[in-house]
Amino acid sequence: MDEEFENDFPYKVMLNQQQDPSDAQSSPTFVPSANPSLTTPWLQTTPSANRPTWLPLQQHMHQLRHTGLLPAVESSFVHGHRRSASAGVGMGNFSNQATIPSNSPAVSNMQPPTQGGQPLYPTNFFTTSVSASSDSFPNSPTVPSKFSLNPSVATSTNISPRRHAKSHSVASVSSPNSHNAVPFTPHAFVPPVNNASPLPALNTLPQLLRPRNLDAQWRPSSLSQTNSPTHAANPSFPGTIVTHNTSNFRPEGGGHRHRRSTGSLSVGSSGSGFSSGGSGNPRKNLFSPYLPQSSIPALLAERRLVTGILIVSKKNRSDAFVSVDGLDAEVFICGSKDRNRALEGDVVAIELLDVDEVWAGKLEKEENRRRKDPISTRGSFDNLRIDAVPFEVPQRSAIKARDDEQVEGQTLFLLDQKQLGADEKPKYAGHVVAVLQRAPGQVFSGTLGILRPSSAANKERQTSSGNQGSSNNSGNDKPKIVWFKPSDKRVPLIAIPTEQAPTDFLGNDQAYAQRLFLASIKRWPVTSLHPFGMLVGELGSMDSMSAQVSALLHDTGVHSEPWEGSAATSAVTALNALSDNFLNVAGCADYRSEDVFLFVKNDVSKAAVSEVKQHESNINSSSATDFVSSAFHIRPTSTGYHVGIHVTDVSRVIEPGSPLDRELQRRSIAVNLCQKSVPLFPTTLGEALSLREDKDCYTMSLLLDVSSTGKIRGTWIGWAVIRPRKAYTMKEADELLQTDARLRLFHTVSSRLRTHHLGTDVPLSRYCRLVRRWDEESCSFDPNETNLFISSAVEVLRETLLDAANRAVASHLRQEFRENAFLRTQRLPSRENCRILQSMAIQMGCVLDLSSTKSLLRSLSLIEDDTVRNILQLYYYKVTPRAVYEMQKYKGNLASQMMSLGIEDESDDLTHFTAPLERYGDIVVHYQLQLLLRGELASEKRLRVWSQAANDASRRLVISKFAQETSIHIKIFSDWAESQVWQDGLVCFVAPSYFDVFFPSLGMEKRVHLDLLNLTHVRFEEDQGILSLYDESGAVTVVKLLTSVKVKLFVQLSTPPLINVSNVEF
């Protein structure tokens, strides 16, 4: 296999397929270094006497990146039904297997289009002004879709003899051959295909649609496909949900709770529902086999299936939800059987079911569970009365109380978790019929146990009651497996072979109760309730903060492994090219005479920089300093100000599509935690690209012509070379803000830009740091400041200039690239959440303007009370979906749903441009600007790669933000002292069964459940947001927003650590 694809971006599935010569893109000649030190050795795990030598972690993750992890997607037909591949050979080990149909996704290379058209910009820069031309960047030629399913390829579906809930197609279907099939797009509907277009023969189909040879090595795809033809069109949804039986495949009758097949879309199976497993002992299928991968595109085209990313509820792990583009509500997945072995974050194919039958089954199951729990007899959370009549305090079951303690205790904020009550029937329901994509190399942290948690609890109860049970299994019987309990409760228990456990584990398992291990899933057959996996390594004791941080990085999927292979070689080549061509200022504007300054997080001395340069031979040097992406210069003019924002030019040395570029796309973002940072770039290359004091630097520069009132009258973008004269640390700049002439001018211009943008002049102290939508992941994160509600004045001013630069670049991209522009957008909060936010504001004595994001920020900034402002921005932050990248062309009609609260003018367009050393999204924007400066067109293939990068980078930004907040929570736990047991807080949200408390000193929020308090009755007045608490003495305590409370907190060692409420005083 070609080296370029052998080390390709791992969120793709590449089979034994050679690159088409026409696909080759121009790239510099890479000269491999002969220095053996450039090759990073595998991370070795030191063996010890009491545990075996496991596969080294980095080697294991490298192998996972090149082997399959989709659960039981390999299949064969045995005894009349489709059997899991678990009998015999596990996932990722397909030796000596026959060529059989497969569910594994594959990717085919796209043919690049022939580019045409003349360059729009013959020079190396372009300018805009108020009267700028509206000439648009012409759309790149579109490749006609050649990926259609031959009608002779029949869908493997049979009428199931089992009863099944009524399933729904998404549009009326007259017959299975009524539409031509097209490949699927993750979490999107596939649009109708032109029936007049010819269909290719079977041998011309991409491997995505063909049976796959299991002898071939392959890699799983990610949550999206980089070169997949499935991005040929991102569909709008023209059809409607059909609520009647329209398919001749659909079985008669319902019975959602009793089916053992995929219903109307079942694969061929016998009526027995048992698998021999290759051993002669039949085992019952606990899950439905996945549909053949080759049948998925046709079913999507016929509106028989929908696709999306699976999200498992943290509050109730039996529930899951799939967000589908084109549907006005999420699809509800009820229970583990309907989830069908899919994991959090998987791209899944969903068949819609009858909502009434699914919901009735869920309510019946909840009622049965409630009857078994005597604690729940005093009250129910599902039928709370919210009028002015006192009602009995609802009691949580022991299981729910424990789940609440774990979910609410490990987060900094109480994020809006999906949880359905008895009166919240979903609009759509469905079940998983195939896992289409899964992030490769997933490794989970957790603990080991001999018994499953449920079995251990039963044994403990038997022991406490004096019943030791049967002793037949005690003594010489050695268990074949031990159980791995993941830290993330959404991940199922994993069965691990006993041989992989520490040698003394069976005889001394309690000694390992507080030890953190790493494990991965190898396979999950349909006959097993739990997946089978393997131990990867041991992190250490749970009370070690370094082990906690390592567990956090693994559980969130942060790529912290060293650079190796062709990506590391490509990084060295880029570093050498940067050194050899420095300084080639041809075509660059020279701003070395300008008074350029920059800001750094830490005090980066010249000695530290020199130390880094001594390690340039090692691409993974640990002597890293803070990378600086942006610098500024400001000069007064006769009518205003000349402002320059200079951003390091990464596109100068990174070739799109190179191994370095693909590895940067895989990592997507630098992760900044309180305890450590995981950079996006290799240390030496990042240091070479970083802007430094008294160093000549290549930049992509943006010049702003700013009026005296803060209005931007014109912009210029082009390549430049600068030499910063001064580097301020953030602490130093705060101290000199009013005395340093350079910083005073910086303060004046930034303040006027902010005043003009918001339409009002507000103090810097009222800056709403938490709800800024352009930098949610906080690349400027300060590990010493854990309160996210506090910002320094210099940081606010700096971000104002960067925000102006991002909006100016977004305006250029929108004008030139139109629907191909790489922009940052945000979904609307739900109407109900907007109503609650406005109601909260009114109860606290203010009114918010929710007509647009800008107007909301303006309203929040006008609130003088810090506490009220922080509570409102906290709630808005929790209920607003995270901002994402998008290219409108590949989003269909989703774009209209993805804008912010509203757009007041074109300047509200946003993108990421100013931090290319921290975010891959900024690198894509630099690529697009490079095309504009060169007057070139982007190929359709390259645009699809960028659309894929938008999906991946958006997901990674959310992960980075969650990791940041969790690291703050871990730091608060590690610094905990007995004096912090009682904390002063303010009520920030009120509900019938709980109220939330905000702690201003910690910047943290916790929940107080009413069943923790000694109460007899409660009364909730929803219209006024008042909760009245009645205790046994008859006293009444009124709780509403801004009520001062004193809360007793307690900490508990877990992964992540827990901080919860034990008592409250009013």
From Swiss-Prot:
Gly residues composition bias: residue spans: 270-280
Pfam family, one: OB_Dis3
Residue ranges, compositional bias (Low complexity): 18-28, 168-178, 464-476
PTM sites of type Phosphothreonine: 157, 262, 377
Boundaries of every DIS3L2 C-terminal domain copy: 983-1033
Molecular function in Gene Ontology: 3'-5'-RNA exonuclease activity; RNA binding
Residues in RNB domain copies: 618-934
GO BP term, example: nuclear-transcribed mRNA catabolic process
Polar residues composition-biased segments: 29-40
Residues carrying Phosphoserine: 264
Localization: Cytoplasm
Entry keywords, A to Z: Cell cycle, Cytoplasm, Exonuclease, Hydrolase, Nuclease, Phosphoprotein
GO terms for cellular component: cell division site; cytoplasm; cytosol; P-body
CSD2 domain: residues covered: 482-556
Matches recorded under SUPFAM superfamilies: Nucleic acid-binding proteins
Location of the region described as Disordered in the Swiss-Prot/TrEMBL record: 18-40, 154-178, 247-286, 454-480
Family statement drawn from the similarity comment of this UniProt entry: Belongs to the RNR ribonuclease family.
Function description: Required for the maintenance of cell shape during interphase. Required for localization of cortical actin to the growing tips before mitosis.
Assembly, per entry: Interacts with serine/threonine phosphatase ppe1, protein kinase C and an osmosensing MAP kinase.
Protein name per Swiss-Prot or TrEMBL: Protein sts5
Species the sequence originates in: Schizosaccharomyces pombe (strain 972 / ATCC 24843)
Gene giving rise to this polypeptide: sts5
